[in-house]
Amino acid sequence: MIEAATIVFAEQGLDAPIPEIARLAGVGKGTVYRNFPTKEHLAAAVAIARLEQFERRLADVLAERVDPRATLRGMFVAVASHLSQDCALGEAVDVVADDPQVLALQRRLSEIVAGVVRDAQSAGVIRQDIAPADITIMIMGVARSLPPLNHGGQPELWERYALLAFDSLRPDGSALPAGFADDDEMRLALRTARRLRVRRGA
C-alpha cells in the first residue's frame, strides 16, 4: 500500500483519492483505512519509507570512499536525482513535518550531510562560509522545481541544474550574507512557510 501511495501521490499529489491507491495496491479502500485511518497517516508512512531509502542511498555514496569533493558531489547528485523524480516525498514531508519519526530521520540525514560538508571544508575543496543547511536548501530548490519539467519531456534537466548549483560551492565564490544558524532553524523556517501556504490556500 505504501508503494502504491507513493506512485499515486507522485502522479496526482496528496489530493489523490484513496480508492485510486487501493486499486493500484490491489486491496479494498477499507483495508487502506484500517491500516492508515487518515491520509496524513498514509503520508507519514510514505515520507518515512522514502527518507529511509534516502538514508540507504547516502550510505552507498559514503561507502565508495572517494575524495571529499567527489563524495559531496556524489551525495548532491544522488539526492537531487532522487528528489527530482519523486514528487511524493516533498509533499508528504510537508504534510507530516512534525511527525517524530520523520523528524528523527531528517536529523539523521542532516548529520550525514554535515559530516560530508565538514570533510570537504577541511580539505579546502569547497567554500568555508556554507553550512549543511545551505546544502539542503540548494538541493531542495533544484529538485522541487524540476518534476513539472520532467513530466514535460525534459527528464534529465535535474543533472544540469544540480551540477550548476554544486559548482557554486567552489572555494573562490563571492562572499555571502548570513544564512541559517543550523538545521533546526532551517526546519523551523520551512514549517512556518508551510503553515502560511496552507492558510493562504496555496
Which residues does each PLM region occupy?
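Generic hydrophobic, amphipathic alpha-helix propensity
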Residues: M1-A5, I21, V46-R50, F54, ...
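Helix-turn-helix
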Residues: A4, E11-H41, A45
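A short secondary-structure junction motif
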Residues: V8, Q12, F54, H82-G90, ...
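Amphipathic alpha-helical interaction segments
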Residues: E20, A70-A78, D134-M138, E156, ...
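Hydrophobic alpha-helical connector segments
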Residues: A45, E52, R56-Q85, A97-Q101, ...
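Amphipathic alpha-helical packing segments from all-alpha helical-bundle domains
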Residues: A49, A97-A143, P147-P148, E156-R160
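Short linear capping/connector segments at secondary-structure termini
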Residues: E91-P100, G179-D182
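C-terminal peripheral helix-coil segments that are non-catalytic and often amphipathic
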Residues: A114-S122, P148, G152-A202
